């Protein structure tokens, strides 16, 4: 009788730094009831991957889940599939770290009583060089999307077998996940999944259909708990799939012990199809979306889809400079702390992928997720002896200056207006400059955005830092400034400054303001409670303008509103504690929240990424300013 082998798998993950209540809700709505339901069906088999962040939470908070999982492994109902333990994008971290991450995951599986041989590839981000890594880490098979195989030229009919892939003389088995099953399960009636699997039944005993997708689909996603548990979808699915004569339930390891892969394929750099849209720069992503829409209107998409390719995951590091900077700080620390096992665990945690990219929801736009990465990066950095360094940290071709003492790490980009782009506290493990700029995203279609939000919507022309130098008309207003509708009269913001490092950092530049020659010099001194900066601005002619020093801070837990006032200081209170910025001279101060617009499960959301504070001083021919940034415990 024709039959189809069927492998069913779930991937459970929570981002580093996610809110406790979200993890608890996912546990109660998805992880716990799924495993308890599985226990009721002894003939049902599931391949399970759990990321390290979630593993650590479960071990601390829900040991009974771990015990139940161990029991199901012992009964042969569950096969553990591993990954990089803290869920990194493997191709985005050094080779040594890849192996270490996978071996950490394999070590946990061994503790659970299982010798794991298979790998769930995070976000299915594949590059051929991974073959060597995976083999070195003791991995025999890896699970990818069928899109990877179609991108290599395989037809849909050829996607129901695993294959070998080779690189540099090493080979590994690759299983394709069936896309149609991902859309059927659990959203469509069980009968539709059964009918589809029956349609695949074949006399070839080695034919296999693979479903492996997010475990959160089974209860944590909106509306799924009611569908999957209250309306009995999962029980019906387990009951019918495990008793169907035409369907042979298997685990990956069982399949490989019985059948050989179909042959040899060479897979290109790829992830799942949607990722190729999201990773493109916003304007190209919009064109890509329109192109797909046009193909669908012409009924050509399915026929020619294998030739439609967008961007690759690493494009996100180009698309979001803040993510790239965080990524390069991680690479720096990975290299410098290679032989420090205590510090390395913080580096490995900071490699958790979620904070480095953005699809439709969350990702880099979630401050609490970035904050957790920075916390671990700064903890790791604290194991290094403080020293000043000059090097191209973020691989943009310009040298960064890293000033450091026992309490702080301060990074200046002379080629980006001589501004500060990292101010990290070793006492509080916080980067005060963890601020993502406001950017246009390809899904920002104005017809969809609520009217009230449109009025606040604005996009930044440059990344946000500290000590960013503005020349403005005295009649300029805060409303224009915060909506990026003002006129910048100088050429200092994004231009290169000269620098000299002694016991202090001196930065200077000769530029133009309304065609007039102007020199700006700023001198930075790092001290035990923050830093001081002294400005000296000299113009060859009278300017009659305002000089503004902009300081952006990662104020993310206190809701702020635009304000204008006169003062010599501001005190900022947030989840990181208190900081104070003092000016020797009274200044007009502009304050406004930096809010990015992104989508969530509930619709559109503004997310406060930080707050901009600009100290404004009148300038004619000469101006001297002294500012202090002070951290309070």
Curated annotation (Swiss-Prot):
Domain of life: Archaea
Main EC class the enzyme belongs to: hydrolase
EC number: 3.2.1.1
Keywords annotated in UniProt: Carbohydrate metabolism, Glycosidase, Hydrolase
GO process annotations (BP): carbohydrate metabolic process
Alphabetized GO MF terms: alpha-amylase activity; carbohydrate binding
Transmembrane segments: none
Catalytic site: 123, 214
Position of the signal peptide: none
Coiled-coil segments: none
Catalysed reaction, written as an equation: Endohydrolysis of (1->4)-alpha-D-glucosidic linkages in polysaccharides containing three or more (1->4)-alpha-linked D-glucose units
Family note: Belongs to the glycosyl hydrolase 57 family.
Descriptive protein name: Alpha-amylase
Source organism of this protein record: Pyrococcus horikoshii (strain ATCC 700860 / DSM 12428 / JCM 9974 / NBRC 100139 / OT-3)
UniProt gene name: amyA
